Amino acid sequence: MNMMDANEIIAFIQKSEKKTPVKVYVKGNLEGIDFGASSKAFITGPTGVVFGEWKEIEPVLAANADKIEDYVVESDRRNSAIPLLDTKGIQARIEPGAIIRDQVTIGNNAVIMMGASINIGAVIGEGTMIDMNVVVGGRGTIGKNCHIGAGSVIAGVIEPPSAQPVVVEDDVVIGANAVILEGVRVGKGAVVAAGAVVIEDVPPYVVVAGTPARVIKQIDEKTRSKTEIKQELRQL
């Protein structure tokens, strides 16, 4: 797993073109109207839809106010620095409503559930499930064959760049609504109980619980059976 350097991310955001993409439904005498070089217009007779940058389309609408009877603008961001990740080529199961920003790495057969938010520079290992409404912060790194329970927070760090993000090693199970704070490393095969707040490193193959989280026992067969990772859920 390759973690992006914080300064690389900062430079990426600084240098990126800030964008306000819009979708405009337009009606009127549209023949001959040029909505801009970077816009895509799908016009049929007196109605159409235009996709493009607001800074390019807005002056066109104003300049052609006498020809345009009405229009409706759909916009979901303003001066956005980071696009969403293009997931079409990723060999993973990604459900509707997951928000995954660009420069995120997702391993094969991972599962990203509805409402999950994964920030720039994060790494999701092969076969790992990110459950509903999980937040994985910038540069948060999660290993292979993990389960991150619904509503959990894997804290990320972009600034200050010297700070360390969370690292979750392979085969870890994190219960619902747990919080793993910045700089914590969760060891291989560990289990974090639901609702725990983890403020220090977790050794491999232990169970931690509470606020703040403390080791309550070593992993045993009973714990393994209760936290088994089912590969059937990860098959494509």
Curated annotation (Swiss-Prot):
Keyword RNA-binding among record annotations: no
Residues passing through the membrane, by range: none
Pathway: Amino-acid biosynthesis; L-lysine biosynthesis via DAP pathway; LL-2,6-diaminopimelate from (S)-tetrahydrodipicolinate (acetylase route): step 1/3
Role according to the record: Catalyzes the transfer of an acetyl group from acetyl-CoA to tetrahydrodipicolinate.
Lineage top rank: taxon: Bacteria
Keyword set, alphabetical order: Acyltransferase, Amino-acid biosynthesis, Diaminopimelate biosynthesis, Lysine biosynthesis, Repeat, Transferase
Similarity comment: Belongs to the transferase hexapeptide repeat family. DapH subfamily.
GO biological process, one term: diaminopimelate biosynthetic process
EC number(s) recorded for this UniProt protein: 2.3.1.89
GO MF terms, alphabetically ordered: tetrahydrodipicolinate N-acetyltransferase activity
Protein name (database record): 2,3,4,5-tetrahydropyridine-2,6-dicarboxylate N-acetyltransferase
Catalytic activity: (S)-2,3,4,5-tetrahydrodipicolinate + acetyl-CoA + H2O = L-2-acetamido-6-oxoheptanedioate + CoA
Alphabetical list of PROSITE patterns matching this protein: HEXAPEP_TRANSFERASES
